[in-house]
Curated annotation (Swiss-Prot):
Cysteines paired by S-S bonds: none
Extra facts: This is a SET 5b protein.
Compositional bias per record (Basic and acidic residues), positions renumbered to this chain: 48-58
Induction pattern: By abscisic acid (ABA).
Family to which this protein belongs: Belongs to the small hydrophilic plant seed protein family.
Superkingdom of origin organism: Eukaryota
GO biological process, one term: response to abscisic acid
Name of the protein in question: Late embryogenesis abundant protein D-19
Described purpose of this protein according to its UniProt entry: LEA proteins are late embryonic proteins abundant in higher plant seed embryos. There are two subsets of LEA proteins (5a and 5b), the first ones are expressed when the cotyledon weight reach 80 mg and the second set are expressed above 100 mg. The function of those proteins is not known.
Chain segments carrying region Disordered: 1-102
């Protein structure tokens, strides 16, 4: 689904692409996941890579492991890591699910 979205942006009318590219060059994120890209194409490439990386990680860990890792990451804040906060609040995180499948 996401790759179709990026392909649609690449195939957008020239005028629309120029407008998005100008906004990207001013520092605006115009593609979800394209943070820090300095042009429309750069943002699309970054977003595609991040999406593929996440999908690969999900395949390696399996759905349960990926969800468990997200649960731990979602607990982190600027003061504490996810593991510290989980321990502090009594939330159980099963890190055995983080192991990659062989």
């Amino acid at each position: 689904m996401a790759s179709e979205q990026y392909q649609a942006m690449r195939n957008a009318p020239q005028e629309e692409k120029e407008e998005l590219d100008a906004r990207a060059k001013q520092g605006e994120t115009v593609v979800p996941g394209g943070t820090r890209g300095k042009s429309l194409d750069a943002q699309i490439n970054l977003a595609e890579g991040r999406h593929k990386g996440g999908e690969t990680r999900k395949q390696q860990l399996g759905t349960e492991g990926y969800q468990e890792m997200g649960r731990k990451g979602g607990l982190s804040n600027s003061d504490m890591s996810g593991g510290e906060r989980a321990a502090d609040e009594g939330v159980t995180i099963d890190e055995s699910k983080f192991r990659t499948k062989n």
